[in-house]
C-alpha cells in the first residue's frame, strides 16, 4: 500500500452559504453532500480538519530576514486549498479513482494527488 495526500483546490466550486451555492439546483446540492459523505467512508481515507475560507488566510513570506504577512491565500481564492485528505491506496491509479469522486473535481476545482515520501 502507498500513501497519498489529496489536496482539494476549490477553484470556482460553489461553497455552502454563498450565492453561487444557493443558485445550484437542490438536487445537485444534495448530490454534493452525499458524494462527500461517501468519500469520507472510503477505506484508507483520513480527511483533514475543515479549513477556513481563503479570504481569512494569512500568507507568511520571509525575505532577507524580514517577515512579511499578507492577507489572503497565497495563490488567491481560485488557487486556494479548500481541504485535504490522506489516502492509503494500492497505487496511484487507485488514488486517482478516489480523487475523481471528490465533488470539487467536477464543479470548477481540481484535486492534486501527491505521494507521501518517507525520509
Where are these regions (language model features)?
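Conserved, structured core segments of small domains
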Residues: 1-119
Amino acid at each position: 500500500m502507498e500513501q497519498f495526500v489529496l489536496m482539494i483546490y476549490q477553484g470556482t466550486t460553489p461553497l455552502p452559504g454563498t450565492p453561487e451555492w444557493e443558485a445550484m439546483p437542490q438536487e445537485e446540492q444534495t448530490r454534493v453532500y452525499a458524494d462527500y459523505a461517501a468519500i469520507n467512508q472510503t477505506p484508507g481515507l483520513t480527511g483533514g480538519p475543515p479549513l477556513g475560507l481563503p479570504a481569512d488566510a494569512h500568507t507568511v513570506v520571509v525575505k532577507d530576514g524580514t517577515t512579511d504577512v499578507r492577507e489572503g491565500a497565497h495563490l488567491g481564492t481560485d488557487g486556494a486549498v479548500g481541504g485535504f485528505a490522506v489516502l492509503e491506496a494500492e497505487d496511484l491509479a487507485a488514488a486517482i479513482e478516489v480523487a475523481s469522486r471528490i465533488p470539487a473535481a467536477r464543479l470548477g476545482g481540481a484535486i492534486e494527488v501527491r505521494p507521501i515520501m518517507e525520509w
